[in-house]
Amino acid sequence: MASGSRTKHSHQSGQGQVQAQSSGTSNVNYKDSISKAIAQYTADARLHAVFEQSGESGKSFDYSQSIKTTTQSVVPEQQITAYLTKIQRGGHIQPFGCMIAVDEASFRVIAYSENACEMLSLTPQSVPSLERPEILTVGTDVRTLFTPSSSVLLERAFGAREITLLNPIWIHSKNSGKPFYAILHRVDVGIVIDLEPARTEDPALSIAGAVQSQKLAVRAISHLQSLPGGDVKLLCDTVVESVRELTGYDRVMVYKFHEDEHGEVVAESKIPDLEPYIGLHYPATDIPQASRFLFKQNRVRMIVDCHATPVRVVQDESLMQPLCLVGSTLRAPHGCHAQYMANMGSIASLTLAVIINGNDEEAVGGRSSMRLWGLVVGHHTSARCIPFPLRYACEFLMQAFGLQLNMELQLASQLSEKHVLRTQTLLCDMLLRDSPTGIVIQSPSIMDLVKCDGAALYCQGKYYPLGVTPTEAQIKDIVEWLLTYHGDSTGLSTDSLADAGYPGAALLGDAVCGMAVAYITSKDFLFWFRSHTAKEIKWGGAKHHPEDKDDGQRMHPRSSFKAFLEVVKSRSLPWENAEMDAIHSLLILRDSFKDAEASNSKAVVHAQLGEMELQGIDELSSVAREMVRLIETATAPIFAVDVEGRINGWNAKVAELTDLSVEEAMGKSLVHDLVHKESQETAEKLLFNALRGEEDKNVEIKLRTFGPEQLKKAVFVVVNACSSKDYTNNIVGVCFVGQDVTGQKVVMDKFIHIQGDYKAIVHSPNPLIPPIFASDENTCCSEWNTAMEKLTGWSRGEIIGKMLVGEIFGSCCRLKGPDAMTKFMIVLHNAIGVQDTDKFPFSFFDRNGKYVQALLTANKRVNMEGQIIGAFCFIQIASPELQQALRVQRQQEKKCYSQMKELAYLCQEIKSPLNGIRFTNSLLEATDLTENQKQYLETSAACERQMSKIIRDVDLENIEDGSLTLEKEEFFLGSVIDAVVSQVMLLLRERSVQLIRDIPEEIKTLTVHGDQVRIQQVLADFLLNMVRYAPSPDGWVEIQLQPNMKQISDEVTVVHIEFRIVCPGEGLPPELVQDMFHSSRWVTKEGLGLSMCRKILKLMNGDIQYIRESERCYFLIILDLPMTRRGSKSLG
């Protein structure tokens, strides 16, 4: 079965298609998945041919043996084409319904199933007059087969853009009056009409039944959404219970498709009499690629009775090929599948596709791709037919399940990535700083990076194994084989060393089947090993009895499991894409090892990156200024608070609404001073969440007003909370972007309580009246006001009476995909079921194709007796100014995120060159140096330590809140001065500025206690800024240092040091000084640095002043440092 694809992939992985480095892995993975699918199509086609041949020859179909042979034969292209044609254009349907295909333009029948005449009572005997019998033939006008009202419905459906959204259409046979569900879809030659007999003759009951099915699905969806996050198993267990409750099948399972295309039953709900299938693994060809493609096109598939004889389709001889039945609900199962079902005792089945978002690489035309994650399958031990409305409700449930599953998988992926990243960092640190054996003997070890049975480090000819691994002699043989056949690659991965071509694979046995290896250097390797798959696979089903001689030949879940174990014999579990990404990421060590043998040649690159970062910050500042201008002039109410909830931003619009000026609002408490009591709890929760980074959207709050009419009115605003963050991503407040909905709120209250002249209000052209539509208890549209007509382009007469879900929003007003329709259906049913929905994001295309983005509020609708009779829905459209403000905000957030990524990248990547500098310094220290050279080396080392500490403590929050840990060490003050001066020498030369040093000679040998690196950082930053703004050329900057000794006690002496950094002229720009001393939100990048240095100095009990005189300006830095006895003697 899938062994063909798997064997080929493993062989390629081992024989030369070596895995790429992490930078290109995702693209390789995508291409690899395509090649797997193509290979499986070949295996599927071969298996199908063997089955067909066995039927023609009268021989039995040996299932397990056929799976083995598919891996050993080449399939001609014609055979694959014939196989796909058989699957998609099989020419037969199931007999529980009938099918008619029609030319779309003329309504002329072009194909029909042989049972259509009987099912529609169209036989000649049933016709009163034989002059013109209404017998169904090719060329018949399909409208003549049904009642006039049914024909009108068909004509209307044929004119719809999205015909499937109108399904099912309730129609009646003209001769017998029998009702049918007509399920329509377009194909290449016309429209296919699947006709399924309905159980009642009252269309109203049909609609009520469909709505009831939807309500059951919504209840199940609500249950799914209420589950705690982070548990995919619980989600799958819940969905099988829900589907079994909805449909009544004896067994419901969740099948999951693995990356190598094989499947696994991960959840199951069944009646007690049935054998469990939970944990069953089966080969990929059990569900062929062609079938998987069909599941993506037609997401619900029902087989009513696998024993039933399929009905042939008769078609117009002028058609070029058999009619396509891909989208037909009646398509007959393939004989191979029907036999499989019969063998396992499953007479009827219902299969629901589980679709999630695919990889970015699979996206086409900018649209996100969809991936078939698995299937939810129901089995029944007797024939069973589920009516279309209930199947449609199950499809909605699957869409919600797919959404929920997608979120859970993304969360699990993020947690896994964080774990891998943490492990990678620790492993890299061990290899660079400690003995290489640390990654094996310490925790975490390389076994924690990916799932494996053993791992090893082969370094400088020594072997460090962990877990289940080859012997040292075997590993040396593997290394020799790698260098001989794969010496020019960066690594290798395979799930079968035997298939990869390693001659000694047989000697390793089942203990070591799969291997992944990363080349650290040409002599150093990291290995991961996996044992054979069967060790990992367990099936919860009963084992077959030894006397069941034909067990392997018959198609049955047990034989599938046996076949799967045969396929994966001598194989490990495949290495998943994410695991290979984690392994490849360690290849960064190759560069680190090389850097340790060289110098800081990469420093220039990082300097260029630094310039790019600063340029990006300038652009971000520009965006921020534009954002401030928009906020101040916006016609939408916008206000902001600090971390204590006090107003620090209040634009003109919110001032106008509340009659509270900017000056009066600043500093007031949002919750206690400005919000009505009834909204205080909502505002507190909103603020609390936003300060934790959870940004709530579309929340309604009621604001107080402060004008003369304060007792007679209130202001209602719907706001989005946006966490305000500083440069280091720390939350420093919350900004609220709102929309005034006061007028709409008043109208809404009147509607809900049915006050005043209802129709006059609804259809008023007053711009305060929002777009409104209403639903009856069956989700049919009962109201569509003037504003709604204007918004959508659809008149009231065209809309009233149609189904809101699918017919109006779906066909008339197109939605973006089935997920949007599922969410809308849930909102509508919740409102009818007494659960109101407020400010739900709702988007659709109007009649002219314009995309409308809005907020939807759905409330229950009651009559005078208080009984719920439907739902009222209000649509709010964001103002252009608000939309522009949100666009700018998103742009700012995107830019900020980009800068944070660059900063994180810089902090990570700059460590390797620093290690190179450190290593080079250590080599130089061991050589014979002059005194001057030793001083240069000491200065270089001091600068390196300063850079390392800045990178290591990049979290500025510790500096802001005073929790930064300062080190205490003894050092020469002269060394600090040398290191500080060295950092400005290039800038001095570039700007032709002279440096004057007024420093007493005894400072050079003065020893003090303190955090040398932080003192060095602070002085260097102040000096650098003074040099940057000194007059140029022919300017000067002077450093003055005046030490004074203070005797604190007999044993403690403190040196009181005053540093002066002086330059002539105007000095620093005013905004820089403002950033340094006063601003909580910096404007300039230099100002941020100065502000942080001032706070670091404050932590050391120091002080900084900036003094501007008539002809010069200077920094005055005051710092007290404890002295050693030796230091005090040198000063004395």
UniProtKB/Swiss-Prot annotation:
Contains one covalently linked phytochromobilin chromophore. Residues 231-409 form the GAF domain. One of its GO terms (molecular function) is photoreceptor activity. The keyword Transcription regulation applies. Residues 905-1125 form the Histidine kinase domain. Residues 1-11 have a biased composition (Basic residues). The keyword Nucleotide-binding does not apply. Coiled coil: none annotated. Residues 623-694, 757-828 form the PAS domain. Residues 12-26 have a biased composition (Low complexity). Keywords: Chromophore, Photoreceptor protein, Receptor, Repeat, Sensory transduction, Transcription, Transcription regulation. Phytochromobilin binds at C336. Residues 1-27 are annotated as: Disordered. GO terms for biological process: detection of visible light; red, far-red light phototransduction; regulation of DNA-templated transcription. GO terms for cellular component: nucleus. Belongs to the phytochrome family. Regulatory photoreceptor which exists in two forms that are reversibly interconvertible by light: the Pr form that absorbs maximally in the red region of the spectrum and the Pfr form that absorbs maximally in the far-red region. Photoconversion of Pr to Pfr induces an array of morphogenic responses, whereas reconversion of Pfr to Pr cancels the induction of those responses. Pfr controls the expression of a number of nuclear genes including those encoding the small subunit of ribulose-bisphosphate carboxylase, chlorophyll A/B binding protein, protochlorophyllide reductase, rRNA, etc. Homodimer. This is Phytochrome B. The lineage of its organism: Eukaryota, Viridiplantae, Streptophyta, Embryophyta, Tracheophyta. The gene is PHYB.
